[in-house]
Amino acid sequence: SHVVASEKTMFAMPETAIGLFPDVGGGFLLGQLESGIGAWLALVGAKLKAYDLVQLGLATSFVNSNEVQNLRERLISNSPKNNQEVSSIINTFSSKPDIEESLLKDNEKIIKEVFSYNTVEEIFQSCKQALPNKFIEMQFDELKHKSPTSLKISLKQIRAAKDMSLKDELIMEYRMVQNCLEAGDFFEGVRAMLVDKDRKPNWKPSTIEEVDNDRVNNFFKTLDDLDLKL
């Protein structure tokens, strides 16, 4: 009910860089955002600081890190009985985050325009059409290094998550991760980014054009008796 960010807070879902997708409920969170913003965060793995998190509703309050311990002690000592009392205590310590750290301040409009499409191919084309916008150029460069398969399943995931409960989205993630371990780029992504750290993953397929709809849809198939039970 209360998510407090500080100037040290960083939010990112960078899983497409290792052949995965926004997991641990991340797809659900991104699916509730405006479509262009959610897709941008899922595909690019952009890093957001406190100002943007509060603006998007991913955080409910901002408290400077030097006040966090005081806030914690006040919450413990006052033993608030309901959310309203919790909010009142947090508001005592809250302040405004630094807008200068915002990525969305100058780029929200173009992000929504470029990333609101329902296919990765259309998003790539939209990036090209937006050039020479420097911000979009950086996002496009990031996209070209991600797993093509991960890009496609991540976009399908967050579009579907928009109309799902958290429970159903987690079941979907469970299906996806089983397939990532069996037929995806996950092991190669971990090797390239975390083990050998050569940052040169050999994605298979290596282009978005080679990742057809049948391959994408296979990641979302029911596991029948092996499906996650929640």
Report residues per predicted region.
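Conserved catalytic cores of soluble enzyme domains
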Residues: 4-109
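Intrinsically disordered, low-complexity segments enriched in small/flexible residues
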Residues: 65-230
